[in-house]
Amino acid sequence: MFPSIFNQAWELSAVKDYDPEDKSGFFSSTYRAYNCAMTLICSAIIVCDRFLARFLYAKDFYSAWKYVPWLTIAILFGALSGYMGGFFTAVKDSRIFATSTLVGAVSNIALNLILTPFMGPMGAAIATTICYVEVFVVRYLQSKKYISLKLNVLRDSISYIFLVLQSIVLLTLPENFLMYGINVFLFGLVFLLYLKDIQLILCKVIHRRGRR
């Protein structure tokens, strides 16, 4: 729900304040803050997934925890795709929406046909994640035509790899101290990768409260 609300508000802001050169750094800093928050939340959910499943799911649905990591990563990339979509709304280029959505839809259908017969619901979850990643990549590459964003692509890519590693650890290791230890460690690495962005967010929040 949060990504949906944010992206709706973001589209209005992107149209109003659109600057292809991003001279003020507003669009870049907003993206970094949004990506930082969503990635950390995603990582934390993966860490706590099996623990929370005991309280949130009925016994018959407890096994649904297995699909949470991949679907959470899908939500992350869906949110970032929505952010990039704000730029296309600002420049009134609906073709990118159609193209990226079509790429994701075709990929999702193909991967579901390939993975689901062998992996069941897990195959569908993985296919959905890959689909959202593809949509994000297409929109990110196309956004370069309209705006100059200063992003740390290498740092972000490493953090996404850590999310995948967390998911693999969660799904392959038994629920014990080692499993939680590795995933908490990976969460710590993600946290350190975004430490500067976290500090920037906190400084802005404190500054705004101080002005009230």
Q: Which residues does each PLM region occupy?
A:
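Short runs within selected transmembrane alpha-helices of multi-pass transporters and secretion channels
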Residues: 4-7, 47, 66-92, 96-143, ...
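Hydrophobic alpha-helical transmembrane segments in multi-pass integral membrane proteins
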Residues: 43-46, 109-113, 163-178
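Hydrophobic membrane-spanning alpha-helices of multi-pass integral membrane proteins
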Residues: 102-106, 156-169
